[in-house]
Amino acid sequence: MKIIITGSESFIGKELISQLKTLDYDIIGFDSASPTDPDYEFHQIDIRDPEIYKFIPNDADVLIHLAALSRDSDCKKKPIECFDVNVMGTLNLIKSASVKNVKQFIFASSEWVYDKFIDSEEKNEESIINIENHFSEYALSKLVSESNLRQQYNHGFCDVTILRFGIIYGPRKFNWSAVESIFSQVKNQNQITVGSLKTGRRFVHVSDITRGIVDSFGLKGFNIINLTGNQIMTLKDIIDLSQQILNKKIQVLESNPEQINIRNPSNFKAKQIIGWEPKIDLKSGLESLIPYV
């Protein structure tokens, strides 16, 4: 099975390649960064490069598109680059995949495409998204690319799987989510300040995300699927578990206890369609961070 991965040097990309190697897939990686692992076919190239199609073999089974300008702060500072990379780069890959008859296009989207969550409501893939409630250039760029993929699928493009990733955490040294950041502060400081301890997300470990990508291989038609954690974990949950794991007690302060922010995207469809659900609970996930914080 021939698998192409854009953003192969990213946090998710490296974890995905590690999993794929155990499954004996034929891997081709694209990234603008220099390679850290020479043990697979790699091309240092920008996804906007019109010549990228030359490195895609004919009739590849899956193209997994992870590459993006993904930090929201970067997207706000550089909105033109954000849409150039995330939208035009994706269109260039769609064209390239079409020319080379790729069988399935898997697109890494995000739970941030969902607008406001009111009173911890659960949203699913059929929920109406009001772009007037969006203040994230990153989320808008992902929504535009999702729409472009739907349009191209309707025009005869290959099978399309859009995976809306939840808030991902895992063993890494930078670009932390709230999970890694809090765990590091509990480990290295005696005091931590958060907005509201009741703020919560359905955090999901990177290894569960990559397993979800693999589980979606071969999915027919056009599909949008959330890959999120099984339950909402609050900042208090993370702090309490971190203290338990590290056998340490710290002072916890709230700067805005009444400003509770909860995002609750369902993962029920993933269980139904691809038989996926997270396996890494928060305690095990936090323990995996110890060497990195």
Kindly label every feature range from the protein language model.
Residues 9, 117-120, 143, 147-201, ...:
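NAD(P)-dependent short-chain dehydrogenase/reductase
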Residues 91-137:
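Conserved Rossmann-fold NAD(P)-dependent oxidoreductase catalytic core, especially the SDR/UDP-sugar
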Residues 3-23:
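N-terminal Rossmann NAD(P)H-binding glycine-rich loop of SDR-like oxidoreductase domains
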Residues 186-293:
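C-terminal substrate-binding subdomain of Rossmann-fold SDR/epimerase-dehydratase oxidoreductases
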Residues 68, 83-90, 106-109, 141-142:
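Short alpha-helix in the Rossmann-fold core of NAD(P)-dependent oxidoreductases
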Residues 47-85:
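NAD(P)H-binding glycine-rich loop region in Rossmannoid oxidoreductase-like domains
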